[in-house]
Amino acid sequence: MVPPTDKLEAATREEIDAKLEAAGWIIQDKNAINLFAGAAGIHGIAVREMDTDTGPADYMLFIDGKACGIIEAKREGANLGQVSEQSARYAVSNLKFIQRWAEQGQPLPFLFEATNIEIFFRDERDPAPRSRRVFHFHRPETFKSWLDEGPPLR
């Protein structure tokens, strides 16, 4: 019998997958990664349960083959404000054989904490990064544009 919390987490992941796909991300499992999958243009890949040296990130986001972000997924009802330290830890973790959109030791730029109901986002390139509620996941093209522009002016 599957414990109720596992069912909640599985349902949450299914809904997050659907929201990521609606935003243009290709969802992949860590055992079958193709960081350049999809049509020509910007390749936005979300890899489930990606290993880091501090544990598996629920999702690691890649733009054109380089890691650019983390999504920490929690079941409905979780306090996302208390999860930001976990996503921040994954964002600075060492990634074997993976290129990054940040220097080693610097955090990946884009971090999300999400349930099936709400999504928090922060840009670690901001001088004083803070999580804020957003209505949906950003599109890969948006992140690519931001990465090409460099750090925000705030």
PLM feature spans:
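ATP-dependent helicase/translocase motor core
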Residues: 1-154
